[in-house]
């Protein structure tokens, strides 16, 4: 059979259209495809919830690909090994409570497991605003990342979600939108974004879990976005806190969706 270029185009357009239409209303929208966002999405999808993940870049994975300074190994502490085990990601003991994993294997497996669990992943999509009702986030306003990068005047599309997770890391992209458009209303000490502090790995890892919480009705922060929002330090290339943060935010949202 001779391949037909138009049939190839139709197949891609039809399937993407089906996926997009099916995910205009979801239980949870995850913004950011790094480790915390992927773990959260995976846990939620495995529990039977409808989850869509939006990543502004072409590739999924956040900063995990490069390990530290492009040395593509990561460190995970013992308390988070159960997440690696559940996802079938290999690791090796380096020293007491320090385990290493191949960064490429880790993030590619996280992505694969999330997709296989039923998470709808949309890459190259930017969240430019939130959809709001009185005192609550109820969805996202989306556009293509290249549209934003080119500075084109193109109106966005909106989608609805019962809960939104900002897992955009240092940038805290969704929280910044809320802080700008609904000022003084964040559940931080100042009502504003407190800002990320300089590196302190031990403190950062514990605060990552503490700061994984609802920052505005309907909007949760996870991973480094939590520390950047609530004023915690950065942790470097140790990822146990990221994995556990994704697990925690999923558990809290699942409890509220019951």
Swiss-Prot record:
Pathway: Cofactor biosynthesis; thiamine diphosphate biosynthesis
EC number(s) given by UniProt: 2.4.2.59
One GO BP annotation of this record: thiazole biosynthetic process
EC class: transferase
Known cofactor(s): Fe(2+)
Keywords annotated in UniProt: Iron, Metal-binding, NAD, Thiamine biosynthesis, Transferase
Residue positions binding NAD(+): 36, 55-56, 63, 127, 153-155, 224
Catalyzed reactions: hydrogen sulfide + glycine + NAD(+) = ADP-5-ethyl-4-methylthiazole-2-carboxylate + nicotinamide + 3 H2O + H(+)
Cited HAMAP family: Thi4 (MF_00304)
Subunit and partners: Homooctamer; tetramer of dimers.
Membership in a protein family: Belongs to the THI4 family.
Function: Involved in the biosynthesis of the thiazole moiety of thiamine. Catalyzes the conversion of NAD and glycine to adenosine diphosphate 5-(2-hydroxyethyl)-4-methylthiazole-2-carboxylate (ADT), an adenylated thiazole intermediate, using free sulfide as a source of sulfur.
Protein known as: Thiamine thiazole synthase
Organism whose genome encodes this protein: Desulfosudis oleivorans (strain DSM 6200 / JCM 39069 / Hxd3)
